[in-house]
Swiss-Prot record:
Residues 49-62 have a biased composition (Pro residues). This is Smith-Magenis syndrome chromosomal region candidate gene 5 protein homolog. It comes from the Eukaryota. Residues 41-77 are annotated as: Disordered. It comes from Macaca fascicularis.
Length: 152
Protein backbone atom coordinates (compact mmCIF):
# COMPACT_ATOMS: atom_id res chain seq x y z
CA UNK A 1 0.00 0.00 0.00
CA UNK A 2 1.32 3.41 -0.89
CA UNK A 3 1.78 5.86 1.91
CA UNK A 4 2.30 9.55 2.14
CA UNK A 5 5.25 11.81 2.84
CA UNK A 6 5.43 14.16 5.79
CA UNK A 7 8.02 16.89 5.43
CA UNK A 8 9.43 19.29 8.02
CA UNK A 9 11.38 22.20 6.63
CA UNK A 10 13.87 24.79 7.80
CA UNK A 11 15.05 27.82 5.94
CA UNK A 12 18.54 27.63 4.56
CA UNK A 13 20.60 27.10 1.47
CA UNK A 14 20.44 24.00 -0.66
CA UNK A 15 23.84 22.57 -1.43
CA UNK A 16 26.01 19.47 -1.49
CA UNK A 17 27.20 20.25 2.04
CA UNK A 18 23.73 19.41 3.36
CA UNK A 19 23.55 16.05 1.61
CA UNK A 20 23.11 14.49 -1.80
CA UNK A 21 20.44 15.53 -4.21
CA UNK A 22 18.74 13.39 -6.81
CA UNK A 23 15.84 14.37 -9.02
CA UNK A 24 13.06 11.81 -8.80
CA UNK A 25 9.96 13.49 -10.13
CA UNK A 26 8.55 16.50 -11.91
CA UNK A 27 5.74 18.83 -10.98
CA UNK A 28 3.68 20.42 -13.72
CA UNK A 29 2.35 23.86 -12.71
CA UNK A 30 -0.07 23.80 -15.64
CA UNK A 31 -2.03 20.76 -14.50
CA UNK A 32 -1.02 20.93 -10.82
CA UNK A 33 -0.14 17.23 -10.71
CA UNK A 34 2.71 15.10 -9.53
CA UNK A 35 3.91 13.34 -12.67
CA UNK A 36 5.94 10.65 -10.93
CA UNK A 37 6.47 9.53 -7.38
CA UNK A 38 9.54 10.03 -5.24
CA UNK A 39 11.55 6.85 -4.77
CA UNK A 40 13.49 5.95 -1.64
CA UNK A 41 16.89 5.79 -3.33
CA UNK A 42 19.91 5.50 -1.01
CA UNK A 43 22.37 8.33 -1.14
CA UNK A 44 25.61 7.35 -2.84
CA UNK A 45 27.63 9.83 -0.77
CA UNK A 46 29.21 13.24 -1.35
CA UNK A 47 30.14 12.32 -4.92
CA UNK A 48 26.48 12.31 -5.98
CA UNK A 49 25.51 14.95 -8.47
CA UNK A 50 23.39 17.94 -7.58
CA UNK A 51 20.13 18.61 -9.45
CA UNK A 52 20.65 20.13 -12.89
CA UNK A 53 21.50 23.81 -12.71
CA UNK A 54 19.03 26.12 -14.45
CA UNK A 55 20.32 27.83 -17.60
CA UNK A 56 21.51 31.39 -17.17
CA UNK A 57 18.77 33.42 -18.81
CA UNK A 58 16.78 36.50 -18.01
CA UNK A 59 13.28 35.87 -16.60
CA UNK A 60 10.52 35.95 -19.23
CA UNK A 61 8.25 38.98 -19.33
CA UNK A 62 5.12 36.82 -18.99
CA UNK A 63 4.84 33.52 -17.11
CA UNK A 64 5.82 30.72 -19.47
CA UNK A 65 5.03 27.41 -17.79
CA UNK A 66 6.80 25.48 -20.52
CA UNK A 67 10.05 27.28 -19.61
CA UNK A 68 9.60 27.07 -15.85
CA UNK A 69 9.00 23.42 -15.03
CA UNK A 70 9.26 22.87 -11.31
CA UNK A 71 11.22 20.07 -9.73
CA UNK A 72 10.48 17.78 -6.85
CA UNK A 73 13.80 16.68 -5.45
CA UNK A 74 15.00 14.83 -2.41
CA UNK A 75 17.83 15.45 -0.01
CA UNK A 76 19.52 12.33 1.31
CA UNK A 77 21.69 12.00 4.36
CA UNK A 78 25.14 10.68 3.48
CA UNK A 79 25.74 9.16 6.92
CA UNK A 80 24.12 6.40 8.93
CA UNK A 81 22.26 4.93 5.99
CA UNK A 82 19.23 7.15 6.62
CA UNK A 83 17.37 8.87 3.84
CA UNK A 84 16.28 12.37 4.78
CA UNK A 85 13.94 13.94 2.27
CA UNK A 86 13.17 17.50 1.35
CA UNK A 87 10.79 18.25 -1.49
CA UNK A 88 10.97 21.55 -3.28
CA UNK A 89 9.83 23.15 -6.47
CA UNK A 90 12.36 25.45 -8.11
CA UNK A 91 11.66 27.71 -11.04
CA UNK A 92 14.15 27.75 -13.88
CA UNK A 93 13.67 31.49 -14.26
CA UNK A 94 13.91 32.30 -10.54
CA UNK A 95 16.00 29.51 -8.95
CA UNK A 96 16.21 31.40 -5.65
CA UNK A 97 12.47 30.87 -5.13
CA UNK A 98 10.69 27.62 -4.52
CA UNK A 99 7.68 25.93 -3.02
CA UNK A 100 7.90 23.16 -0.45
CA UNK A 101 5.39 20.35 -0.22
CA UNK A 102 4.86 20.44 3.53
CA UNK A 103 2.60 17.52 4.27
CA UNK A 104 0.01 15.12 3.01
CA UNK A 105 -2.18 12.40 4.43
CA UNK A 106 -0.70 9.11 5.51
CA UNK A 107 -2.65 6.18 4.11
CA UNK A 108 -3.13 3.37 6.66
CA UNK A 109 -1.44 0.07 5.91
CA UNK A 110 -4.77 -1.73 6.29
CA UNK A 111 -6.18 -0.04 3.22
CA UNK A 112 -8.94 2.46 2.58
CA UNK A 113 -12.60 2.25 3.51
CA UNK A 114 -15.23 2.67 0.81
CA UNK A 115 -15.76 6.30 1.86
CA UNK A 116 -12.02 7.03 1.74
CA UNK A 117 -11.83 5.51 -1.74
CA UNK A 118 -14.07 8.32 -2.98
CA UNK A 119 -11.70 10.98 -1.70
CA UNK A 120 -8.40 12.02 -3.28
CA UNK A 121 -5.52 9.99 -1.86
CA UNK A 122 -3.52 13.13 -1.22
CA UNK A 123 -4.98 15.48 1.34
CA UNK A 124 -4.80 19.15 0.47
CA UNK A 125 -1.06 19.67 0.80
CA UNK A 126 0.21 23.14 1.52
CA UNK A 127 2.75 24.66 -0.80
CA UNK A 128 4.95 27.17 0.98
CA UNK A 129 6.14 29.95 -1.28
CA UNK A 130 9.36 31.78 -0.57
CA UNK A 131 13.06 31.16 -0.26
CA UNK A 132 14.52 27.71 -0.85
CA UNK A 133 14.10 25.55 2.22
CA UNK A 134 16.53 22.93 3.46
CA UNK A 135 14.78 20.06 5.20
CA UNK A 136 16.27 18.26 8.19
CA UNK A 137 14.75 15.43 10.21
CA UNK A 138 12.45 14.65 7.29
CA UNK A 139 11.22 11.10 7.20
CA UNK A 140 10.07 9.21 4.15
CA UNK A 141 6.67 7.59 4.48
CA UNK A 142 6.30 7.15 0.71
CA UNK A 143 4.22 9.19 -1.70
CA UNK A 144 0.81 8.48 -3.10
CA UNK A 145 1.06 7.28 -6.68
CA UNK A 146 1.65 9.26 -9.83
CA UNK A 147 -1.11 11.65 -10.79
CA UNK A 148 -2.16 12.55 -7.25
CA UNK A 149 -3.70 16.00 -7.25
CA UNK A 150 -2.27 18.86 -5.23
CA UNK A 151 -4.05 22.01 -4.21
CA UNK A 152 -2.26 25.29 -4.83
Amino acid sequence: MRRCLRVKTRRGQLGLASGCFEQHSCFSPRVNRILSAVQNTPCAGPSSQAPPQPPQASPPAAPDHSRTPSLLASSHSASGGESLFQLYMASLAWPQNCCVLESCRRIPLGGLSSMENRRPLLRKGRLLRGQIHHGQDNQLWGLTGAGALLSG
